[in-house]
Structure formats: C-alpha cells, structure tokens
C-alpha cells in the first residue's frame, strides 16, 4: 500500500482538472510532490488552472502529450476521465501507477468511512445519513459525488468522526486499497454504458466498494438484488433492506420500520415521499444504527427530512396542491419512480433535451397522470405520448410557462410534479437551474396576504 508520506518529491501527474483534479493537485503539492496537471480541454482562461499556476504547478492543456509520462509519474486520475483516454491507456501500457482521487483521499485520512453507491438513491441516502449524524452527538462529514471533493474533506475530518461518502461508478473504478467500514449499494440498474461499455463492467465497478472489506466491516444491500453479490467471496458482515418482506437486516412490517425486532418508526410519520425512498430510508437507518447513531436522533431526522434539492423535493403547497421539484430526473427510470410515488391525480411537467429516446416505457406509470404540460426539445414526443394515453396535454415554452399555464386548470388535491425525464441543456445550463426556475415560479403564484 502506498503511504501518503511516500509522495514527497515524487513526480505526480493529475489528469483531468475540474473540482476534484484541482483539490487533488493542491493536496499533492502540500504533501511535497512534484505536481503537473494535464487536461484535454483548453484551460488558458480557467480560474482553477490559473490558481494552480500561481502556486507553481505546471498546467498542460488542450491535448494529452505522452511526453508527460517520460519521468515515470504516479498518475492521479479525475473520475470523469475514462480509462480509454489516450494518455491513461499509454500510462497503463508503461506500467505506471494510476490512483483515483478517492484513493488519494483514503490514503490521507484515518476516519472510518460510510460509502454509498448505486444507480439511484445514493445522494438521498448519503444526505439522510448526514442528517441523522447531525441530529446526534456524533460527527459525520459529507464528501464525494455529493459535491464535496473527497480529497479536500479528508484533510479536515478527524479520526473519531465519520467520512460519509457518495461514490459514483467512475470514482469506484480503479480503486486499490480503499476500504469503507460501512458500504451501501442502493441498487444497480443499467446506466453509464457510454463510459463502461457493458452492463457487466458497470456492475463490477459498483462492486469495487466492498472488495477490500474485512470481517470487521459491514455491507448493506438491496435484498431484491442479492443475486448480484451472492456469488461473491464476501468477508464483511452483510445485511439487507426490503420494503416487501422480513430479511436479515431492516424491513417494513405492519407499517413500521423494523430492525432486530424493534419498531423504529411508523412509515406514516415519514416526510420523504415514494416507495423508492422507503428503500433509501431503510438503508440510511441501518447504516446509522451500525455507526452508533441513537434511535432518537434517527427518528428526529426521519420526521423532518424532506429530501434533496431537485430530487423529488417537496417545495410547498398552493391552495390544496402540493408541488414537487424532481428536476434531477434526467432519465426515464428516475421519472418512473417519481410517477409511482403518488396516489393523487398528477399534473406532470416534462420534457427537455432530445437524445433520441422514446418514452413508451413510462406508459405503465402514467395511470395517475391527469394533465401533461410538455416543453423543450422533446415536447412533441411527450405530447404524442400523452395523446396516445388519453391525457390532457398542454404545450409550454419552458418550465416557467408550464407553471403559469396550470394555474387555471389545477383541481383540488392535484399533485404538481416537475419530473422532466430529460436533461436540461436544451434550455438551461443545469438541472439545478431548471429546478430553481420552477421553484421561483411556484412562489410567484403564492397568494399574498
């Protein structure tokens, strides 16, 4: 295992800048390494690149010259850089050591780790665990794919605190020594095949989360996908979660969350909506119990935690209508979960960037949809879908116009749901911007007293 003290005076090449590459480069400089940064994009006007250069770090951008490998550097790879990128392939061929930014964070911290991965739900689970810690006397620091760069947070967390880390498949691919004390796999579905090429490769990347665990560690998995790990040579203590049956772990029985025969909370008291979020809640509760969070703090969190911004986020009620912002739903699977979360009639706001998808797979989930308000490049596709199912379809220019147009047709107890099933880039820079526009427009229609 590489000790971080061994990085002093070593040549290190950070490939890929962005936030994680920027923080990794600063950390490596602090550890005494001879650092260079390389990015295929032109970074001549990039603020982070200029900041690194002011520290004496050489930044080479616009291409990946193989000459950067001639002094046999250790490679620290940004998770967004595929292993198929030319300079990474060449480094592999030369037998150079390639670290991920997450691996670097592991090398410098002695804090126990709760690591969360999965196709869906990982951000919610990570944030909910963090909230449960916050409600207790324990300290947990969020990091990773949730927006807080792991190598930065790892420098700040103390050995008696927990590092609560969300990990994407990109971050897990290529880890060597990384070992969480508690690992969670929420679920695994087909995703990111443009990066991983095959479903098997994607699944194997996710499984990296537990490969170094020992008998003193814990693995938490979805019981209904247990076949994905049953053939594995697991050393960690393995527990499951299920909303459908009693399992060795945590489950729902008679309307209560139950662990070890003890009722934790009635599901009617949960604020977070949706069957899929029940699974997320179970995983978070189990991890927090294992970590030593008191049950009272867990319950205090569950009766107040309303979700993550832009992920089936309850934003308020106007008259008798509840509004939910699910702008993060940039694919059909996420929207399936959203549509399946409500028994009330739904006014569904949908549409966005056209990636050539068809949306017929949403039909089985549209039973409660009363009105569709469609916008963006996929507007006509969604209009066709709605008409084929006999739904009332309204065309809008964008999200703001969609909120305006429903004001005269909304009925008592309708749920207003923004769940686009598409990326935002046809009209907005990010899904966050799209969600904020939705929230702002909702607030504009609130009555003033």
Curated annotation (Swiss-Prot):
The Gene Ontology terms for molecular function here are:
ATP binding; UDP-N-acetylmuramoylalanine-D-glutamate ligase activity
Record-linked InterPro entries: Mur-like_cat_sf (IPR036565), Mur_ligase_C (IPR004101), Mur_ligase_C_dom_sf (IPR036615), Mur_ligase_cen (IPR013221), MurD (IPR005762)
Keyword Cytoplasm present in the record's keywords: the answer is: yes
Q: Could you tell me which pathway this protein works in? A: Cell wall biogenesis; peptidoglycan biosynthesis
Residues annotated for ATP binding in this entry? 118-124
- What family is reported? Belongs to the MurCDEF family.
What protein is this chain from? UDP-N-acetylmuramoylalanine--D-glutamate ligase
Which gene does this sequence derive from? murD
């Amino acid at each position: 295992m590489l000790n971080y003290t061994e990085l002093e005076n070593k040549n290190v090449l950070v490939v890929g800048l962005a936030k994680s590459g920027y923080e990794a480069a600063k950390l490596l400089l602090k550890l005494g390494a001879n650092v260079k940064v390389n990015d295929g994009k032109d970074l001549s006007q990039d603020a982070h690149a200029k900041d690194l250069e002011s520290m004496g770090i050489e930044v080479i951008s616009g291409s990946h010259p193989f000459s950067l490998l001639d002094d046999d550097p250790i490679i620290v790879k940004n998770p967004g850089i595929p292993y198929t990128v030319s300079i990474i392939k060449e480094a592999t061929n030369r037998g150079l050591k390639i670290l991920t930014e997450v691996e670097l964070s592991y090398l410098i911290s002695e804090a126990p780790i709760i690591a969360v991965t999965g196709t869906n739900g990982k951000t919610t689970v990570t944030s909910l665990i963090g909230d449960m810690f916050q409600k207790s006397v324990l300290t947990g620091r969020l990091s990773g794919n949730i927006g807080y760069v792991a190598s930065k947070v790892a420098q700040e967390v103390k050995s008696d605190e927990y590092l609560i880390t969300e990990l994407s498949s990109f971050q897990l691919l290529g880890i060597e020594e990384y070992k969480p004390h508690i690992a969670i796999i929420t679920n695994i579905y087909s995703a990111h095949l443009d990066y991983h090429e095959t479903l098997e490769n994607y699944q194997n990347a996710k499984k990296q989360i537990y490969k170094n665990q020992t008998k003193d560690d814990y693995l938490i998995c979805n019981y209904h996908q247990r076949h994905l790990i049953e053939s594995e040579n697991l050393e960690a203590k393995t527990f499951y979660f299920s909303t459908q049956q009693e399992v060795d772990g945590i489950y729902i029985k008679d309307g209560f969350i139950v662990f070890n025969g003890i009722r934790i909370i009635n599901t009617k008291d949960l604020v977070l909506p949706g069957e899929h979020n029940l699974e997320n809640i179970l995983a978070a509760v189990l991890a927090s119990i294992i970590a030593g969070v008191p049950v009272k703090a867990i319950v205090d969190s569950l009766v107040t935690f309303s979700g993550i911004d832009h992920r089936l986020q309850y934003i308020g009620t106007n008259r008798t209508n509840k509004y939910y912002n699910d702008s993060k739903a940039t694919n059909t699977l996420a929207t399936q979960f959203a549509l399946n979360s409500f028994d009330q009639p739904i006014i569904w706001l949908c549409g966005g960037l056209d990636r050539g998808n068809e949306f017929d797979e949403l039909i089985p989930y549209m039973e409660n949809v009363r009105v569709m308000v469609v916008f963006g490049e996929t507007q006509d596709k969604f209009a066709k879908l709605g008409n084929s199912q006999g739904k009332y379809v309204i065309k809008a220019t964008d999200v703001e116009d969609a909120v305006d147009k429903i004001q005269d047709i909304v009925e008592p107890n309708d749920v207003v749901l923004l769940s686009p099933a598409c990326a935002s880039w046809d009209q907005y820079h990010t899904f966050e911007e799209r969600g904020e526009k939705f929230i702002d427009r909702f607030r504009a229609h609130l009555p003033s007293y």
